[in-house]
Regions:
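Contiguous beta-strand segments within globular domains
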Residues: 41-73
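Surface-exposed, short loops/turns at beta-strand junctions within beta-sandwich domains
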Residues: 8-15, 121-126
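Glycan-recognition and catalytic cores of secretory/periplasmic carbohydrate-active enzymes
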Residues: 17, 38-43, 55, 72-113, ...
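Extracellular distal adhesion/interaction modules in secreted or cell-surface proteins
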Residues: 1-10, 100-101
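Short strand-edge motifs at loop-to-beta-strand transitions and within beta-strands
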Residues: 116-118
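Acidic, Ser/Thr/Gly/Pro-rich low-complexity segments and short DxT(G/T)-type signature motifs
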Residues: 12-43
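Short proline/glycine-enriched turn/loop motifs at strand-loop junctions of beta-rich domains
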Residues: 13, 26, 64-68, 72-75, ...
């Protein structure tokens, strides 16, 4: 157990050697040298990614949770930015971060910690710096670099997606995290066909766990339901993840030199397809395997409950099921797959053509099979997104006409129109 000890002094501490002792043997004595211009303080938060020289704002925050003590308000304290040679290159006083009462999730101030802001946007020279607060200390070193800060962030996010892959072993050749293959039929995992659709679950018509648990235990086994990316903190793989595939496609299509050159150290690295697209294909291929011969898309795989305590993805004891097909899931897949095929075409035309044909089949099935239940307009809202993506990828005027006839450019949220 880690305990944070907050000590309040009547006056700011000078730079000095400090020894902390406790009245009993429960806490061992701690000795350290305190210098507010170099000593680390967890109260000073800087960007782990760093900044570009021309970033409009470069900020750090100062905040610490006092436990059961009184809130610690540091507004007005002096701050400095110090380079590697110890030179002060910027300074100022802490400003309050929030200018109005804090109301988090409608529940007031959940942290009980005041937050102050440091804006050091005037620092533009590349290098490594410390952001320090008088009588408090300094945050972790922050770097200003021309090319590495945002690129590093993009690589970390995409690498995190690789670690969310289902149906693949993680080994030392691609990761410091090693785990067995998870949720793969060759390892004895049995996944059966459910009657409930992911759209019905998404619309809260029924709870997913309860509906799946009611599935016939002898229902049809779906042989090829492996792959995709795990969802959040559990092992679901839902068609929503095609949004990620579509966003990855946008990155590579719009910025081929930058996003297309990112090397993620994944199994596909070096195969001629940008790594960002290769990882997106891991999800697209999963849903293509779930596609029925008539084009319908089944909306993913889910188990009958949240992960069991002390279990892991490769030893998941819960029963797993494939959702039944529905038009909303088919539109979502059609939009993402068409966008991905469009981005993939310059690198692997054959695979792109197969993916685009799959996307068209999904869109055509959704057009011919409107919802048989009240879906609160979800399929209708997704329809123009799929049509726009299919038109962009194929040039087929029928999809253009469908966009024109169905898109609500006045009331529909921009993200719903792609």
């Amino acid at each position: 157990v880690i305990h944070d000890i907050h000590l309040r002094f009547a006056d700011p501490l000078p730079d000095t050697a400090i020894e902390l002792t406790a009245p009993d043997d429960l806490v061992e004595p701690v000795s350290f040298d305190f210098e507010d211009g170099s000593s680390f303080s967890p109260a000073v938060h800087t960007s782990a990614l760093g900044h570009r020289p021309d970033d409009a704002r470069k900020v750090a925050t100062v905040s610490t949770w006092p436990g059961e003590g009184e809130p610690i308000d540091l507004v007005g304290a002096r701050w400095t930015v110090v380079d590697v040679d110890g030179n002060e290159v910027a300074d100022g006083v802490l400003e309050p971060r929030a200018t109005e009462p804090v109301d988090e999730l409608g529940r007031g101030d959940l942290t009980g910690a005041s937050s102050a802001l440091i804006d050091f946007g005037s620092v533009t020279d590349p290098g490594e710096y410390l952001v320090c607060v008088d009588a408090v200390g300094c945050g972790p070193p922050v770097r200003i670099t021309e090319h590495e800060s945002w690129r590093s962030g993009a690589v970390k996010v995409l690498r995190a997606m690789y670690h969310q892959r289902s149906g693949i072993e993680l080994d030392a050749s691609t990761s410091s995290i090693v785990r067995p293959r998870a949720h793969h039929p060759d390892d004895g995992v049995v996944i059966r066909q459910a009657e409930i659709t992911v759209d019905e679950v998404r619309g809260l018509r029924r709870g997913a766990f309860e509906a799946l648990a009611e599935t016939d235990p002898d229902a049809e086994v779906v042989e090829d339901a492996w792959g995709g990316h795990f969802d959040a903190g559990d092992w679901d793989r839902r068609v929503h993840h095609m949004r990620y595939a579509s966003m990855a496609a946008d990155l590579v299509r719009l910025f081929p030199e930058r996003a297309g050159s990112l090397e993620l150290q994944i199994p596909e690295t070096g195969d001629g397809v940008p790594d960002a697209l290769a990882d997106a294909l891991w999800t697209a291929d999963f849903f293509r395997r779930l596609q029925l011969p008539d084009g319908a898309i089944r909306g993913g795989v889910e188990t009958t409950g949240h992960p069991v305590e002390n279990s892991a993805s490769w030893i998941d004891p819960l029963d797993a099921y494939v959702f039944a097909p529905d038009p909303w899931a088919s539109y979502v897949y059609a939009a993402g797959a068409a966008n991905l095929a469009r981005a993939l075409e310059p690198y692997d035309a054959g695979r792109a053509a197969e993916l685009l044909a799959s996307a068209e089949a999904a869109g055509e099935w959704a057009e011919a099979n409107p919802p048989s239940y009240d879906d609160n307009g979800r399929a209708e809202r997704e329809q123009p997104v799929a049509a726009a993506s299919l038109f962009a990828a194929t040039g087929d005027e029928r999809w253009h006409d469908l966009v024109r006839d169905t898109a609500n450019f006045v009331d529909q949220a921009p993200e719903q129109l792609g």
